Amino acid sequence: MNTVRVTFLLVFVLAVSLGQADKDENRMEMQEKTEQGKSYLDFAENLLLQKLEELEAKLLEEDSEESRNSRQKRCIGEGVPCDENDPRCCSGLVCLKPTLHGIWYKSYYCYKK
């Protein structure tokens, strides 16, 4: 019975002493991993920030192009109905009542001068 107690005590002492060494090693490993994790998070954050900035630049560029191209025309082209009281025909055109084939229409149209 004494040999069992001595063996158990010996195993217990070895486990405790080696466990302490492992605990210190584990603490060191955890510190290294957290430092690496922080650097990885910083890298990932910078990468995400760059992608967002590129996306923002593209969106702003598209908005500026869209605003240039979305300007409405302020004049009416040739052969398009117009209002005789408020003619908005383009330069070189006049708002006139149709002749010949268009006399049955009650509207005015933009024609060349």
Swiss-Prot record:
This is U11-theraphotoxin-Hhn1a. It is found in: Secreted. One of its GO terms (cellular component) is extracellular region. Residues 61-83 are annotated as: Disordered. Disulfide bonds join C75-C90, C82-C95, C89-C110. The presence of a 'disulfide through disulfide knot' structurally defines this protein as a knottin. Residues 22-74 form a propeptide. Probable ion channel inhibitor. One of its GO terms (molecular function) is toxin activity. Belongs to the neurotoxin 14 (magi-1) family. 01 (HNTX-16) subfamily. Transmembrane segments: none annotated. InterPro entries: Toxin_22. Keywords: Disulfide bond, Ion channel impairing toxin, Knottin, Secreted, Signal, Toxin. Expressed by the venom gland. It comes from Cyriopagopus hainanus (Chinese bird spider). Residues 1-21 form the signal peptide.
